[in-house]
A protein has these predicted regions:
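Rossmann-fold scaffold of SDR-type NAD(P)-dependent oxidoreductases
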Residues: 11, 77-88, 134, 179
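Conserved glycine-rich cofactor-binding loop
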Residues: 14-15
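Catalytic loop of short-chain dehydrogenase/reductase
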Residues: 88, 94-114, 125-170, 182-187
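Rossmann-fold cofactor-recognition segment
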Residues: 48-63
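C-terminal helical subdomain
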Residues: 166, 170-221
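Conserved Rossmann-fold cofactor-binding substructure of NAD(P)-dependent oxidoreductases
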Residues: 60-75
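Conserved glycine-rich Rossmann-like NAD(P)H-binding loop of the short-chain dehydrogenase/reductase
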Residues: 28-44
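Conserved mid-core alpha-helix of short-chain dehydrogenase/reductase
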Residues: 64-67, 108-119
């Protein structure tokens, strides 16, 4: 089993990590749908990585996500994978510095994860090798006052992924897997992340082993 011939959607694809993942998946033979909220950045990504399918959507809007799902199904059919890269960081200032404004910006990534995973749930369950992956943070295991808002959102996202994993395990074929990657920072790890995503469809990457897993990504020694 490989990712070749699989159809994978990257949510929040216009970042450096999104571009790296898109390129690695295309090079490995996957069909890739890249989703972004900025038309200019999305157009640049489509031009930079030939072969990807670009889709503009606000992933924090439930109706927009449902419309996205209909367009994706019409253009490329059902998905085999979702890579959720919607994110960002705000923090500092201790507990008193954890502003409501910052939290509302950060929670958009969790909102997007919930909408996208629900919209493509049936695709992933029905696929012979459904995969959904997120990038979380090592701060979930060691929270700090200055990153309380950020870490709370990441912890909620990890909890959602464990719930998806339980749902996948109960499905008739149990062929899908929900995977969490943790990083201290994505800067400099774009290639490592891309390789890890492609490896989700390796022959030895069976769903039972992957499902519910949490793996820290680090730079090669």
């Amino acid at each position: 089993m490989t990712v070749a011939g699989r159809t994978v959607l990257i949510a929040g694809a216009t970042s450096a990590s999104g571009q790296a993942v898109a390129r690695a998946l295309v090079d490995a033979g996957a069909r890739v749908v890249v989703v972004g909220s900025d038309q200019g950045r999305l157009d640049a990504l489509v031009a930079e990585v030939p072969g990807v399918v670009g889709e503009l959507a606000d992933l924090t809007d439930g109706d927009d996500v449902l419309e996205l799902a209909m367009r994706v199904h019409a253009r490329v059919g059902d998905l085999d994978g979702v890579v959720h890269l919607v994110g960002g960081w705000r923090g500092g200032g201790g507990i008193l510095g954890q502003s409501e404004e910052d939290y509302r910006v950060l929670e958009r990534s969790f909102t997007a994860l919930r909408y996208v995973s629900r919209a493509f749930w049936t695709d992933l369950v029905d696929s012979p090798a459904g995969r959904i992956a997120i990038v979380s943070s090592t701060t979930v295991a060691a929270p700090s006052a200055g990153s309380a808002n950020y870490t709370a959102v990441k912890a909620a996202s990890e909890s959602w992924m464990q719930a998806l994993a339980q749902g996948f395990a109960k499905s008739p074929d149990a062929a899908a897997a929900a995977v969490t990657f943790r990083v201290r920072s994505l800067a400099g790890l774009e290639g490592v992340l891309a390789d890890a995503v492609v490896a989700l469809w390796d022959a030895e990457a069976d769903a039972a082993t992957l499902n519910g897993s949490v793996t820290e990504l680090v730079a090669p020694a």
